[in-house]
Design a protein with these regions (language model features):
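Surface-exposed beta-strand/loop patches in extracellular or lumenal glycoproteins
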Residues: 87-99
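N-terminal Sec-pathway targeting helices
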Residues: 1-15
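Hydrophobic alpha-helical membrane-insertion segments, chiefly the h-region
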Residues: 16-26
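A surface/secretory-pathway sequence property marking extracellular, secreted
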Residues: 99-140
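Short beta-strand elements of extracellular/lumenal beta-sandwich folds
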Residues: 67-88
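Extracellular/luminal low-complexity Ser/Thr/Pro-rich, glycosylation-prone repeat/linker regions
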Residues: 25, 31-55, 167, 178-205
Length: 205
């Protein structure tokens, strides 16, 4: 009889230990998920550009995030707040360096108006010219027929990936940005004000 009670007690103890172990492992699995902040971000560059050379109130500001690992460029993300003057037909343009391609674009520009579609105000242009400084252009709120698009505000996120599997650390690249438009002496001009945002893995954050 004593042997039977002892066996029952041991089995109950083992069962309790098993239940406690399972509950502990379950708790560990649910609490082990932690958010990653700036994973693989090796460089951040801020920018701010206004159409100061004109009477227009067009501007953009934001940051460029460079992701990389083992001395290679892996992804570039441009996050820009945009404001375009109602009378501006030049809008905002981002010039993408050679050997990079646009993988996705997310935009809220003009999205606060129910009758408008954000993607209608974004266009991507490419050039095959060998002497061109830039191969791809992402234009926001720009009308090449010189008609103002109505202006507006919003946020645009542009994701870039390299055409090649890896990019050398010795290679420095730049993102070109321009804003505004004007007509002077009968000539129309897009991109009245511009900057370049230099990027290099060597420089770090």
């Amino acid at each position: 009889m004593k042997m039977k009670r002892r066996t029952t007690f041991i089995l109950a103890l083992l069962l309790s230990i098993l239940v406690i172990t399972l509950l502990w492992q379950l708790n560990q699995n649910t609490s082990s998920i932690e958010p990653t902040v700036n994973g693989n971000i090796v460089q951040v560059r801020s920018f701010h550009l206004r159409s100061d050379s004109t009477h227009l109130k067009t501007s953009t500001k934001g940051s460029v995030f460079v992701k990389g690992e083992h001395g290679q460029f892996e992804q570039i993300q441009i996050v820009a707040e945009i404001e375009i003057d109602p009378l501006d037909w030049g809008g905002v343009a981002f010039y993408i360096p050679d050997h990079w391609q646009v993988s996705s674009i997310t935009s809220s520009y003009q999205g606060n108006q129910l009758t408008l579609i954000p993607e209608d105000y974004i266009s991507i242009w490419k050039t095959s010219g060998k002497d061109a400084s830039w191969r791809t252009m992402v234009e926001v709120g720009r009308d090449r027929s010189y008609v103002p698009t109505g202006g507006g505000t919003g946020t645009v996120m542009i994701n870039l990936i390299p055409e090649q599997i890896s990019m050398s650390t010795s290679e420095s690249i730049a993102i070109g940005i321009e804003v505004g438009s004007k007509e002077e002496n009968g000539k129309r001009m897009m991109g009245t004000d511009s900057i370049e945002v230099p990027l290099s893995l060597k420089e770090g954050l």
